[in-house]
Amino acid sequence: MTRTAVLLLTLLFLVAMAASDKIKTRELCWSERECENGK
């Protein structure tokens, strides 16, 4: 694979991880502030 392809895959992976973390935080309500706002 070329370096460009590796960089693109790495960026996509990081974006996917960040997006999944936000979704988990909203669903499981790990943040106290979000829990209070949810109530």
Swiss-Prot record:
Free-text note on domains in this protein's UniProt record: The cysteine framework is C-C.
Superkingdom of the organism of origin: Eukaryota
Q: Which GO CC annotations does the UniProt entry carry?
A: extracellular region
Keyword Signal (UniProt): yes
User: Where is this protein chiefly located?
Assistant: secreted
The signal peptide stretch is: 1-20
Named from the GO MF annotations, one term is:
toxin activity
Full protein name: Contryphan-Cal3
UniProt tissue specificity: Expressed by the venom duct.
